[in-house]
């Protein structure tokens, strides 16, 4: 995605939100990684020229209003959604490019996979621990 975006511009600025649950608790997920960890990952990407960190949607709007840029990249899922700064971009001649999401990766899906793997690991450990006890002792406690 960042590679494709970089091919469409000379200088790629990426906005990194500290925690989307600040403005939208219950709607967005809290990041599993710290803002520093996510920043370092973006910094390591050869397509990213600058990283702009923001906390709230108001901060994002202020970034949009004060930064110089000619194209804004959004995922196609936001095409018919009134996202922060969209109208400002339209009013000020900033092209909005909607990129296709050709993959199924999502932070929610990754969280669910990790949860299921950890759950299976815990269940396996419980079964291992139970197997060390005699069946009669187990039966005594299982009947209760």
Locate each region found by the language model.
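Nucleotidyltransferase catalytic core that binds NTPs
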Residues: 1-144
């Amino acid at each position: 995605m960042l590679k494709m975006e970089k091919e469409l511009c000379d200088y790629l600025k990426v906005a990194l939100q500290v925690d989307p649950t600040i403005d939208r608790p219950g709607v967005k997920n809290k990041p599993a990684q710290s803002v520093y960890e996510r920043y370092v990952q973006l910094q390591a990407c050869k397509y990213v020229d600058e990283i702009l960190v923001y906390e709230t949607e108001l901060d994002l709007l202020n970034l949009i209003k004060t930064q110089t840029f000619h194209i804004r990249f959004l995922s196609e899922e936001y095409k018919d959604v009134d996202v922060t700064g969209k109208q400002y971009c339209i009013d000020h001649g900033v092209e909005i490019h909607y990129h296709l999401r050709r993959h199924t990766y999502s932070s929610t899906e990754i969280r669910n996979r990790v949860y299921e793997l950890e759950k299976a690991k815990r269940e396996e450990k419980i079964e291992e621990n139970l197997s060390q006890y005699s069946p009669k002792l187990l039966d005594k406690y299982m009947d209760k």
